[in-house]
Swiss-Prot record:
Record keyword Transmembrane present: yes
GO molecular-function terms, A-Z: transmembrane signaling receptor activity
Species of the source: Caenorhabditis elegans
Family statement: Belongs to the nematode receptor-like protein srb family.
Predominant cellular place of this UniProt entry's protein: membrane
Subcellular location: Membrane
Topology versus the membrane: Multi-pass membrane protein
PANTHER family: SERPENTINE RECEPTOR CLASS BETA-1-RELATED-RELATED (PTHR31216), SERPENTINE RECEPTOR CLASS BETA-7 (PTHR31216:SF10)
Lineage: Eukaryota, Metazoa, Ecdysozoa, Nematoda, Chromadorea
Name under which the protein is recorded: Serpentine receptor class beta-7
Domain of life: Eukaryota
Membrane-spanning residues: 31-51, 63-83, 107-127, 145-165, 191-211, 241-261, 280-300
Cellular component annotations (GO), alphabetically ordered: membrane
GO biological process, one term: sensory perception of chemical stimulus
Protein encoded by which gene: srb-7
Length: 348
């Protein structure tokens, strides 16, 4: 790229300076590595833990939709990140660093769609867990219907909303990155992000209350069958809330930092190239989230499965030795006493 700067569009010069900015460049490589690394825990969790888990089919359908969307997002963004890292090596001119408008618009549309689909699933998971709590005694017998219907509905709803926003998108030039949202729809897209963040925050608070209710129900039932049913609901609810917590933390941080940098970043960075580099660096947080949620889910599932086994074994022992065992012992003595009294009365 030894071309003269004369008659070169400003966008091409900006793309060149940003592409070789050390902060931007290093974080683009970091994003590529994290997206590639996220494929392994996500695939392992879905195939070898989630599909083989004892979760009810409704919850399992929603979790498959949630983690499946994240996995597809990682694959699509991995391709896009590879293109962004590759362009500086193969470009002969500064303008070659810009992604062509039609590819940029398609890539950004797919990115926003796949990034926002998982934000709907925590809300549906909490709703499904609420139904499971209310029907805890016989929920395991409920047929699998609610989960798949909710999963399909959420994907279609998000697709409709994203297309509604992108209907007004005006893309006349290329972009150095697929993740930079077109200026013509940036405000609406960020409002959508804020709305989903608020909903997810309220949802997490409600999920926490739901978990406490599950714990109370589990303690209030003394029969072995009821304990087994409630333990299953409690464990799966606790796992879901742990995943929701990771989701809200990363998505909330990403949304907050991205919006602050876009609208207030110029107060901290006078050089637009430095600001663009920092914005691009923080946008790689989503790849970190994809990796973190995969690893965290494998870990959470392992921990709660072990705790569930210990809890069930403890319940079985309690029936014989604990408070329930004492009640059973008193009942047995009372029955023996009644039978003895009845025999004595008959003999007189």
């Amino acid at each position: 790229m030894n071309e003269s700067s004369t008659n070169i569009p400003l966008a091409c010069i900006t793309a060149y300076e940003l592409s070789f900015h050390p902060v931007y460049r290093n974080f683009q490589i970091y994003q590529l590595i994290m997206l590639f690394s996220s494929l392994f825990p996500l695939t392992y969790f879905i195939l070898f833990q989630l599909l083989k888990s004892s979760f009810h089919g409704n919850l399992k359908s929603l979790l498959v939709g949630y983690f499946g969307a994240i996995l597809v997002f990682s694959v699509v963004f991995l391709v896009e990140a590879f293109i962004q890292v590759l362009l500086p090596f193969i470009s002969e001119q500064k303008c070659d660093l810009l992604i062509q408008p039609k590819y940029y618009k398609l890539g950004n549309l797919l990115g926003c769609l796949l990034m926002t689909i998982p934000t709907f699933f925590p809300i549906s998971i909490t709703f499904e867990r609420l139904i499971a709590t209310k029907m805890a005694d016989d929920y395991e017998k409920t047929r699998v219907f609610l989960g798949p219907i909710l999963a399909i509905f959420l994907v279609l709803l998000d697709l409709f909303l994203i297309l509604l926003i992108y209907k007004e998108a005006i893309v006349t030039g290329g972009s150095i990155s697929f993740v930079f949202i077109p200026a013509s729809i940036a405000s609406k897209m960020y409002m959508f992000f804020i709305m989903m963040l608020i909903l997810n925050s309220f949802n997490f608070f409600f999920s926490f209350l739901l978990l406490r209710r599950n714990a109370q129900l589990k303690k209030s039932n003394s029969t072995l069958a009821a304990k087994f049913q409630l333990e299953e609901v409690y464990s799966s609810t606790k796992f879901s809330i742990s995943v929701i917590f990771v989701h809200v933390t990363f998505f909330g941080s990403y949304t907050t930092i991205t919006i602050l940098l876009r609208y207030f970043g110029s107060y901290f960075f006078s050089d637009p190239i430095d600001l663009g580099a920092v914005r691009g660096a923080f946008m790689t947080m989503i790849s970190s989230y994809n990796f973190a949620v995969g690893v965290a889910s494998v870990y959470f599932n392992y921990i709660y499965r072990i705790k569930k086994i210990i809890e069930i074994k403890g319940n079985i022992r309690i029936v014989a030795t604990g408070q329930a065992g004492a009640i059973n012992y008193d009942k047995a003595i009372f029955n023996i006493w009644n039978s003895t009294s009845s025999t004595n009365n008959t003999s007189y």
